[in-house]
């Protein structure tokens, strides 16, 4: 029994210790790529996206459309680089909350429906990245190591 449990639990645990960098990297690359291009598309089609924001009842659409588009583009870029990861993931998470409330909330009739939205899945991933951080394979990692070696500010 011990051998079976070691094979089913212990061995995968030992292997995964060497791959802790892969989860955050894969998550950052996946959503970073999606939002880099989503933001780019919105930035290059602001009039149409602004009309969509008006139709969804989002206040100040002429301000929030370029702001949201920029958050998506630069947030995606920063996630790809692993730079300012927690801030970028937090900003993109807030964007997903607004997207759900503004464009999808009327379609929610159950928890299953809410959890099935792409925006909710992105929100979960952004929350994880904001809490867990970018991982070792990121630009944030050497900056964090450098900051740790600096004397405390007066």
Predicted regions and their residues:
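Extended, low-polarity transmembrane helix blocks
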Residues: 1-44, 62-70, 74-154
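Short juxtamembrane and helix-loop transition motifs at transmembrane-helix boundaries
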Residues: 46-58, 86
